[in-house]
């Protein structure tokens, strides 16, 4: 699979995670006919674990952003997770599912990004901008507090210390 710019959401961390999932799908493709089932199993396991952590990150982001379809989006993730878990169980049972899994993942990921993930982008970007603004405001507040504290300490010094600090 090759990443295409139209899949970019414009949210750096999400795009980085999506690209990493594509890397896992490509590793799966490379190993699909390998006699090394252990290596194939490792890639499948790592890909599933990473994808689940991505889902948690993404779901938390869109819930915090107040995205109105966060619930249905999470359901789509749950259905996908169930399908992949079933395939992983079949693999663990000795069945050769690499080509089937690769095909399903390839189709699902790109369709999901285009049709589902792009829906939350505006809400998530607005939320992230506000969060960054709040962080900046908090830094400014803390800075002002610190300066005020330093001023108060300076005023509390005795007349001799104030005289010598001039």
Predicted regions and their residues:
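Small-residue-biased structural context
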Residues: 1-166
């Amino acid at each position: 699979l090759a990443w295409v710019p139209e899949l970019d959401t414009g949210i750096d961390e999400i795009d980085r995670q999506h690209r990493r999932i594509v890397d896992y799908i490509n590793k799966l493709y490379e190993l699909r006919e390998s006699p090394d089932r252990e290596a194939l199993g490792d890639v499948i396991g790592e890909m599933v674990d990473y994808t689940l952590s991505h889902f948690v990150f993404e779901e938390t982001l869109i819930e915090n952003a107040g995205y109105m379809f966060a619930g249905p989006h999470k359901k789509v993730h749950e259905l996908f997770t169930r399908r992949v878990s079933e395939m992983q169980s079949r693999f663990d049972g000795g069945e050769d599912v690499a080509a089937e899994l690769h095909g399903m993942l390839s189709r699902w990921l790109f369709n999901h990004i285009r049709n589902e993930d792009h829906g939350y982008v505006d809400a998530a970007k607005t939320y992230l901008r506000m969060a960054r603004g709040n962080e900046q405001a908090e830094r400014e507040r803390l800075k002002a507090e610190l300066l005020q504290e330093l001023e108060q300490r300076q005023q509390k010094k005795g007349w001799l210390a104030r005289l010598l600090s001039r």
